[in-house]
């Protein structure tokens, strides 16, 4: 596997805590990949799921999932992640092919295999930031597949609560060049101050022409949805209590913060993209997805 950087000695991998959610998303991407009407293709996802002890028994195809498409977990929630994958794939490819960006940063990259599965231009560079243990597991699986990235890939093993900006710039990131930033599924877990610090750092490192996509939850009371079928099924079937992992602090208005600093920002519900693509989750009663928002921001180039 090309372009791998040395990793540290941390052992915080995918077998527990927030790391398990990376396996959950990988399982969802695997299920999506095998759908006849798939929104996204990730041929690596099932190998991550089957390669970890904690998830080796999880389904990677819908016809092997209890309840199939009627399952809140393997049907609706997995399709949500499939839709999210497609929308954010499109964001990155549009940033590269239409906006001319050649530098991509994946914050909290998890088991994201976009460096390997998307059709990148050869002069792109993809920086992946996550904890050492997560990246070490990812590399072990990809190495067994002899996977090669489609562009230069720079994995950076560091905790996003540490000086990740320093680690990023030390590995060749160019703050004078436009960047496409992706923060997928990370901000749910960060306290208010940590989200604000991350957004401020992205703003500081972003040259004109940069773009940012991220996901947030806007519920004022997450625990009001504790009995949502989606959360209940994830807790009972996988032992993952998402609400125990999510930060319950009030969320900052990061989109407004970006606008105040000269960015344009649009805020969407996932259901907006369900309607656009003709498939995906739709609103329902006691909906754990009701507060989810996908935000897309751009820093304009000088006229």
From Swiss-Prot:
Annotated InterPro entries: Ppm1/Ppm2/Tcmp (IPR007213), SAM-dependent_MTases_sf (IPR029063), SAM_mthyl_Trfase_ML2640-like (IPR011610)
Keywords linked to the UniProt accession: Methyltransferase, S-adenosyl-L-methionine, Transferase
EC number(s) stated in the UniProt entry for this protein: 2.1.1.-
Pfam families assigned: LCM
Gene Ontology molecular function: any one: methyltransferase activity
Biological process according to GO: methylation
Keyword Acetylation: no
Function per UniProt: Exhibits S-adenosyl-L-methionine-dependent methyltransferase activity.
Similarity remark: Belongs to the UPF0677 family.
Name of protein: Putative S-adenosyl-L-methionine-dependent methyltransferase SCO6443
